[in-house]
Amino acid sequence: MQMYPVEQAALVELEAGLARREAAQPAAEAPRKAGGVALHVRQVVKRYDGREVLHNVALDVAPGEFLAIVGRSGCGKSTLLRLVAGLEAADGGSITVDGESAAKGRARHADVRVMFQDARLLPWKRVLDNVALGLPRTRRGEAADVLAQVGLADRAREWPARLSGGQRQRVALARALVHHPQLLLLDEPLGALDALTRIEMQGLIESLWRRLGFTALLVTHDVSEAVALADRIVLIEDGRIAMDERVALARPRERGAAGFAQLEAAVLKRVMRQAPQAQVPSHAGAHADPAATTAPLNVSWAA
């Protein structure tokens, strides 16, 4: 994967920031207790260049719940995830994570982790060192334990460039989970993987979520993925919540089952019901949902 200078500079800054944080941590720091947190979104508004991308969005997610957000490209779903993560500030309304504001710069970094479509591994660090970023030295052994949980114990000393796309995403997942997040934000994390690898990763994410109990918020274009993983599926259309559907299917879910296929078809039909928006001229810029294509460079992604 080609890395542009600005991306490489961001990775260097990330590594330096994590090193500073590690040095400031008490040597005997213990991992946080596992479990999920409540998320409350209240009448949130977000504008780009005067255009509203999110319109009075209101949403509640219970502790330990798995919520999937679907919708067409540019509908605002990635923007909402960035606001929840504290990567950007809303122009109106409020977002709280476990009762604390998620406003830009105030999100509780220790309890929230984000996993993107690009694993964003540091290419000059081996796999185990990527997972251990930000951990105090007394907890480095946990990185190896989590690598084993995602099935990569034998790749600990490999360089990221030698891994497949699915393996890199497993490392990114391990890097997030080693910090015991109480809220895991997933922004199309499996979008670049082949179909079989996607299904394997979905099973891995579900099994770890069920065991660890964190709250999960998944943004995806894949309705089948949403049905497979989520307790609820929310559809965003033109910056508004157009559907909030509970998934009343027993786990683990079978894609060939009649109930699974029926719900997938119903949600997909609802997503497709909206007519596509007129294409934005190239000279006008893409302001519909910049978060869908712009990689954040000032955050600790899944680290």
Swiss-Prot record:
EC annotation?
A: 7.6.2.14
Sequence positions that bind ATP: G71, R72, S73, G74, C75, G76, K77, S78
Give any GO molecular function from the UniProt entry.
ATP binding
UniProt lists the family membership as follows: Belongs to the ABC transporter superfamily. Aliphatic sulfonates importer (TC 3.A.1.17.2) family.
What CDD domains does the annotation carry? ABC_NrtD_SsuB_transporters (cd03293)
Intracellular or extracellular location(s): Cell inner membrane
The subunit structure is: The complex is composed of two ATP-binding proteins (SsuB), two transmembrane proteins (SsuC) and a solute-binding protein (SsuA).
GO cellular component, as recorded: plasma membrane
Q: What InterPro entries does this protein map onto?
A: AAA+_ATPase (IPR003593), ABC_transporter-like_ATP-bd (IPR003439), ABC_transporter-like_CS (IPR017871), ABC_transporter_ATP-bind (IPR050166), P-loop_NTPase (IPR027417)
What is the name attached to this protein's record? Aliphatic sulfonates import ATP-binding protein SsuB
The entry's keywords: ATP-binding, Cell inner membrane, Cell membrane, Membrane, Nucleotide-binding, Translocase, Transport
Known catalytic reactions: ATP + H2O + aliphatic sulfonate-[sulfonate-binding protein]Side 1 = ADP + phosphate + aliphatic sulfonateSide 2 + [sulfonate-binding protein]Side 1
State the annotated membrane topology for this chain.
Answer: Peripheral membrane protein
Write down the species.
Cupriavidus necator (strain ATCC 17699 / DSM 428 / KCTC 22496 / NCIMB 10442 / H16 / Stanier 337)
Q: Which segments constitute the ABC transporter domain?
A: 39-263
Record's function text: Part of the ABC transporter complex SsuABC involved in aliphatic sulfonates import. Responsible for energy coupling to the transport system.
